Amino acid sequence: MSTKDPHRLPHEKGFHISWDQIHRDSRALAWRLDGQGPDEGAWRAVVAITRGGMAPAMIVSRELDIRTVDTISVKSYHHQAQGQAQVLKAPDAGLMGDGTGILVIDDLVDSGKTLELVREMYPNAHFATVYAKPKGRPMVDTFITEVSQDTWIFFPWDMALQYVEPYRGTD
């Protein structure tokens, strides 16, 4: 059993992802999914969970030559606090059906609440994320990298390139 260090700052257990890294990891996800669809290995469509799943979904759809791409907007975070997941925008109902042949892509599964909600809507879809944390891992079918539950992932779309003063020490 681990106890949290009250002196540790939130960024100290951070995993910083660059654009190059998310691109490489998303391509690796595509390679893992290639030929795994239910229609002679093919997938009918990609659905990105917005907003974090959009970049990985674009890369996966390109790599697998999937031209039908839609989004589902699920909000479960307010700043860095996770709350109740709610669907703000659903994908085309005619496309989705029960999810058969659909790849649902997100950047990360954390607690699994977002994927649980979407899986209830589309039980036969295939859920893939680039990164997975242990609590959410049962909700995802395919992922590339697992990180510890207490790691905060800093994605490139959340970051700015600028000088930052050190938190400790000045010399």
Swiss-Prot record:
Xanthine binds at residues 110, 153. Mg(2+) binds at residue 107. InterPro entries: PRibTrfase_dom, PRTase-like, Xanthine_Guanine_PRibTrfase. 5-phospho-alpha-D-ribose 1-diphosphate binds at residues 51-52, 106-114. Keywords: Cell inner membrane, Cell membrane, Glycosyltransferase, Magnesium, Membrane, Metal-binding, Purine salvage, Transferase. Its cofactor is Mg(2+). It catalyses: GMP + diphosphate = guanine + 5-phospho-alpha-D-ribose 1-diphosphate; XMP + diphosphate = xanthine + 5-phospho-alpha-D-ribose 1-diphosphate; IMP + diphosphate = hypoxanthine + 5-phospho-alpha-D-ribose 1-diphosphate. GMP binds at residues 110-114, 152-153. Pfam families: Pribosyltran. GO terms for biological process: GMP salvage; purine ribonucleoside salvage; XMP salvage. Pathway: Purine metabolism; GMP biosynthesis via salvage pathway; GMP from guanine: step 1/1; Purine metabolism; XMP biosynthesis via salvage pathway; XMP from xanthine: step 1/1. Its EC number is 2.4.2.-, 2.4.2.22. It is an enzyme of class 2 (transferase). It is a peripheral membrane protein. GO terms for cellular component: plasma membrane. One of its GO terms (molecular function) is magnesium ion binding. Guanine binds at residues 110, 153. Gene3D superfamilies: 3.40.50.2020. PROSITE patterns: PUR_PYR_PR_TRANSFER (PS00103). CDD domains: PRTases_typeI (cd06223). Homotetramer. Belongs to the purine/pyrimidine phosphoribosyltransferase family. XGPT subfamily. Purine salvage pathway enzyme that catalyzes the transfer of the ribosyl-5-phosphate group from 5-phospho-alpha-D-ribose 1-diphosphate (PRPP) to the N9 position of the 6-oxopurines guanine and xanthine to form the corresponding ribonucleotides GMP (guanosine 5'-monophosphate) and XMP (xanthosine 5'-monophosphate), with the release of PPi. To a lesser extent, also acts on hypoxanthine. This is Xanthine-guanine phosphoribosyltransferase. It comes from Ruegeria pomeroyi (strain ATCC 700808 / DSM 15171 / DSS-3) (Silicibacter pomeroyi). The gene is gpt.
